[in-house]
Amino acid sequence: HGHNVIGEIWRREVERRMGLAASSESLEGHLAREGERFLVRRPDGGLAVTAGYHWFGSWGRDTLIALPGLTFYAGRPEEGTDVLLGLGSAVRDGLIPNVFSADGNHAYNSADASLWYVWAVQQMLKALPDRKGLIRERCWPVIKNIIEHYGGGKVPFVAPDAEGFLSVGNPGTQLTWMDAVANGRPVTPRHGQPVEISALWYNALAFADSLAKAFGEPEWRRTKQLDAMRSVFFKRYWVTDERGDYLADVWRDGGVETCVRPNQLFALSLPYPVLDEERYASVLSRVRRCLLTPYGLRTLAPSAPGYRPLYEGGPAERDEAYHQGTVWPWLLGAYGEAVLRAAWDVPGSVRELLRTIRPLFAQHLGDAGIGSVSEIFDGDPPHLPNGCIAQAWSVAECLRLLHLLKEAAPGVYAEWEANARKGGN
């Protein structure tokens, strides 16, 4: 009898959610509402972001990447400001905690969370231009603290080189978002200079340069250094093979990791891109051919040795696949930004991208965690959803992506949305 009651509750909830998904609500409105479930109150009354349901806690990197889409672009500016200021006050020696604990003993084990903080401040400024005074008072000191510690070699496992780029970690560490460990060793060793760390660091320095100009603090200007860094970046990371040109995934003294991964997108997509514009088309062409799927981007090209087509098996096997081909929807935000940057025919590019990702919105929202976006999908078709059934940065970056595409080509977007809701093309 108890089973029937539970079955009935389940059936009613499925109907309710399907009804919501079929309502007249816009996709942006729907994702904005879905995003609210990731904003949770901490015991001390502050707001935090849960990375995913049902088993993830609150992580610095995920919080910062998800924050704009969950708050600034979802009509929750106060909540977003609240979380961002809270994170800023948790900075210790230039580091944002990557794992938060209730007792205040946070773990500071990532090389990039602090650099994503700078990006989140940029997103706040873009969405809420009237917050410049708040940024000057509360965020600018944090950004300076981060740059001072990273650039001064005062962050564990992070060493600046003579050209101003950062080398992070050693063969036993995993300090980037591709942080899976199987049998005690990193599955995707990325020590050295991972391409997105170089892009994020350059973006942070360039943003600080523009704030220093705006706030009249010339000692924080870096214009000459930034020009030099762009040419060093190009020399280090640019790879040419028989299929065209793209960016290496990691540069280290003594060679580059030339496997095709999506991290190169951040050199094009961040507010201050480290790669020059005339190089965008070839990078995007390689990423589109090898990594783009209807549900997100593969973490590794299928032709690479070590590519895992399916996320399956025991914990070790799944960890082996986690960043070795598995598809992540959150990367669509960076991909969409890069596409818009490179586009000469904006409506055409928006139409093509929307057509590609239609299944994510037309089918997946009624699947897995109904109404939400999963953490990951298999690298090979049919790209079954896996991992958390509702992932903060998946929902957030999909919302930010739709916002950007709608802003760039409103007519194309409106037509696509109407069709996606009907289940057409």
Model-derived regions, located:
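Acidic, mature catalytic/reactive cores of soluble proteins
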Residues: 1-425
